[in-house]
Amino acid sequence: MKQIINLFLPNLKSMRTVFYEVANTSVSRERFVDFTKIAGLLFLMINSFTLLRLHDSGGEIFVSNLSANSESLMVVTWFTAGMSLFFFSMGFNNLIAWYSNVGRDGSQWNYLVDRINTLLGPVIVWIFSSTIVLNILSRSENFPNYLTTSEDGIMPSIEFILWPLWLVSIYLVMVLFAPFTIYLHKKYPYATVLTLITMTILIDNIDFALNLSYLKLFNYLFFWIVIHQVGYFFADGKIQKVNINVFRYVTVFTYGYLFYQMSASESYLSLASYRLTSLNNEDPPTTIYLIASIGLISLFLSLKNIVENILSNQKLWLLISHIHSNIYTMYLWHLFVFFSIYLFGLTMYYAPLILLITAFIFGNYERSMFKLSSNLVKRVNPLQPWPSPIKARFSINNFALAWLSALLVLLGVIHLTLGGIGQDGFFTLREFYFLRSNTYEGIGRIFIGLLLLNITVRGLKYKKRILGGS
């Protein structure tokens, strides 16, 4: 119980952990990947504070996206497609984590537990804390339950605030499919990526009949696996062998194509829609989003050596690491902060300060779990021989339980993402395809999934302890 309570309380000890990790950072650590991950989430937050606007009109609260009607801001979103940068870095981290677990002791289920716990910790803190705060605020007459979009659509305020959960849902899908995608990358790296890119482009450009329109949703899977797979290429060293000028040419070509599309057609080219308009490039991802993502990743790769040299400065690396140790917390809370600034009549200049205070108060778990490679530990080489099959008893059962537990967590997160937390009451039933439940049941799925997930790792220890005691 004490450990659970400590998750929600600020702790200076967790901040000292960051100093220790920075001092012991391995010289072989890919600091560029850390920078890319941080930049991706910061871009998403910057987009929210610069592109979104809330204003009163005729008793309604209108939410607008400035990039929807401004060509110059549309161009800005091409360079701030932060979610693509984030999942590129996650592809790198997930492949390294897979080999760290499977390559050493063959525990594929331990990989799932580690990867999911890393992000779900801050998410659980956020869900519980925001549930309490939002339900208190919603009792106020000044709290708008719904927002009106530019197309006269209605969006629940809570759903708007919980938009960051979409990243969590995609992250969980990438982790769930990682064992399969890593196998494909090992056997058919280039064929896999080319096939996924082709499928993404075809699904986006084919006009399906109305009864087959659901096929467009497959681009959620194909598109993000493509970006994730590119991170695999960086992790196993294939990208590092490419001449840096190639990335510069790809950057010029992709952005040149986007500028051509802007001048030659009337296509909607913003990459930051926040589900506020029927026309968008993220829901599901389109060819335009794919081209912009490839261009942005290539731009970052062309600057890799410069970034690495800058991050070799220990003081700057300390600053970056402090941001890194709180980045999930800041990202999850940033739309809550944005909405609160409007609600209390503050200016956006307060946003950085409020975000820092929020990260200090609610980021204790993330900081305490923050790890950088120690000088005493060598990074696992992804090029090592493919791990032999596990010989441990019931290993298939453990992996199946871990996978199904992760799926249960994913369903709970999707339910909260679409239904909101406490919107119109905790017991209001919400429907999404085959999901039909209230908020308590959605949160229950997450906790049951996490409980079962962690049993796959810790269950054997408990069994040995019980048998040893008897």
Briefly describe each language-model feature range:
Residues 2-470:
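Alpha-helical transmembrane segments and their immediate juxtamembrane cytosolic regions
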